[in-house]
């Protein structure tokens, strides 16, 4: 492989920026642009050490940057190659100059995710661990971070490998049965082992799939839509949950004319919070577009926060909103409790049909804790302890596990129907291959390229 280089930190002003190199010539290329005290070279130092010096533009020896350089020699590195990390002052110009000098001396600009891809190709991590790197970067809550860390440490990989080993052992018994069909006792034993092993694998796959709903919540967040008539406090609710003024709050109905999104962490529950334009009939063409978008977002929501005005009587529009969210996960919020109550709370609870109803005065910042508790209890009836289970949160993994479950079910069905043993072998092999796709043991190169292209440059 050639030697790659990229800026590994976000571009912009900051305390430190890092240029990373990885490959067989990483140390030699770095030496060409590094000037150490008393003529020290990076090739002469011990691995896993850091050194002060300057990056210079040779042959003029013009000093470009004052740096600290980490030297990490193969194979004890993330990529299992020689790795150099040049720690520069944060900024745009100088760090770019350092990168350009490295490229001029023979490094190639890395593709997105190429450092992690090399870690995978060199056997440092498997595919599920590589995907967990991106999950860790994108984690919005402590729980999501813990789930990603568990996957990075190989918890899912170990489970998948054990299941594949069980299937492989079962296939070995099938092979014996095919090779020695004349022995009835072998056939009987094979049948018993097949049922036991296949049933056990199926149960473990089902256990993993049961974690997928909460796993996806942790990974992607709940699509949470705030709805209600104009001027009931939807934007105030968004701002209270986000703790920032993201939406315009006025007394004028229809102020929010579009969909406003924000990612928030509510007691460990990641929410993709969406504030919609008030749903009502309107002649204003701009507001009408916002209302249509609100209706579309509503259809795709995981959770609805339906806001009503505590100081007004329940309107026909309010009732229609309840009808629009029938059968969905809804929390009803009676806002403006600081004003004289006029709403029929018994009628509201009747329309809520057992779903949570909380009261708030967003103006006085009252009732937010009750709302957060309702959100948490609705989705985590028992608090998730990410250390207790292996969670599946990746859509690709979920799809593969569903296919593997069907394959093992087909194998069990074939055994029950006494189909030829070599037909059962096909289904078992299919399940074994599918599970291999999760960890990258049996996956097409184009899929690998696609997965790593989603990473940021320098990772």
UniProtKB/Swiss-Prot annotation:
Residue pairs linked by disulfide bridges in the UniProt entry: none
GO biological process: tRNA methylation; tRNA wobble uridine modification
HAMAP family: GTPase_MnmE (MF_00379)
Protein name listed in UniProt: tRNA modification GTPase MnmE
EC numbers on record: 3.6.-.-
Binding annotation for Mg(2+): 235, 256
Chief place where the protein resides: cytoplasm
Protein keywords: Cytoplasm, GTP-binding, Hydrolase, Magnesium, Metal-binding, Nucleotide-binding, Potassium, tRNA processing
Binding site for K(+): 231, 250, 252, 255
Cofactor note: Binds 1 potassium ion per subunit.
Stated family: Belongs to the TRAFAC class TrmE-Era-EngA-EngB-Septin-like GTPase superfamily. TrmE GTPase family.
Positions bound to GTP: 231-236, 250-256, 275-278
Organism domain of life: Bacteria
Organism classification: Bacteria, Bacillati, Bacillota, Bacilli, Bacillales
Phenotype seen when the gene is deleted: No visible phenotype.
Subunit structure: Homodimer. Heterotetramer of two MnmE and two MnmG subunits.
